[in-house]
Amino acid sequence: MYYASTCMDHEIVEKKYKLGLNVTDNYKVRYNISLISQIFEGRCDYKNVVRLSLPKSLDLYKTGSNHYAYTLEVNMINVEKIYKLDNFEDVKELIDLGADINEAIKNIIIVNNIDSLKYLLEKGANIDLIDSYLAKMGNIDIFEFLFVKKCPMNKFLPIAVEYGHLNLVKFLVEKGVYVDFIDRTKYTFSEYTPLVAACSAGHIKIVEYLIEKGANYKSSYGVYLAAEKGHYDIVKFLIDKGTDLEKYGLRSLNEVIKKGHFDIMKLFINSGLEIDYDYYIYKAGLRGHTDIVKYLVMMQMSKQIQKI
């Protein structure tokens, strides 16, 4: 039996495979030869699993001595079954066929279904293996269940923040997740706190909430990322709150001038940041930002007049 994992819409997969289209031209797939136990290995967000019949005369190419993954340009002659991984009965059938429960529980599409999640845990799957990207689904009911089951919750906070799920963020913080938690298994950058993630993604309500709950904003890298990505409201909020611009102020200003974020540039200038006007006029001119050049020249002249 041949299996392929895919993220494509199952109806499109079924239609095009049955037409005999070349799978490698249309989809990113992974073939498993009689190894259903390995079907969930790899990505954590496969949406369906397709069971295919291939020509018997096909000469398969093995990609590695210890691997059972195959990539060939072949034409499908039939789609025997499509297992939708958000469907409990389909997941149960795959497990009954021999799919690895500890690989299955890593799939966020599967565990976002409460029945499938309960079934895997009943079968003995390791709850610690649930991928942190489950938080991008924002399903509070799932996380309430996981909390009761004593699943480690810290790793979900940065992802919930990144995807803008304020209610889930509140739930996690209220359940004791450290507001400045850094998931070092995914982020090697030592300052990528949930607040930094919220600033980068532009989620002002989450920024406000995290700071209210004690997140460190004074010397946060978040002001730089918010400035770089043009999130005016977040930059203004952080500056008004008194974030320390000594560490990231000039670096942020350099980025906003490079990208032409005029209004954000004014926030930094008006904050009292000491800058080299000649340098930034030159940088803005190189990028063709004439509005910024004019403003900086005006500010420079004003400063010079004040010194007279």
From Swiss-Prot:
The keyword Repeat applies. InterPro entries: Ankyrin-EF-hand, Ankyrin_rpt, Ankyrin_rpt-contain_sf. The keyword Repeat applies. Coiled coil: none annotated. It comes from the Viruses. PROSITE patterns: ANK_REP_REGION, ANK_REPEAT. Keywords: ANK repeat, Repeat. ANK repeats lie at residues 100-129, 152-181, 190-217, 218-247, 249-277, 279-305. This is Putative ankyrin repeat protein R835. It comes from Acanthamoeba polyphaga mimivirus.
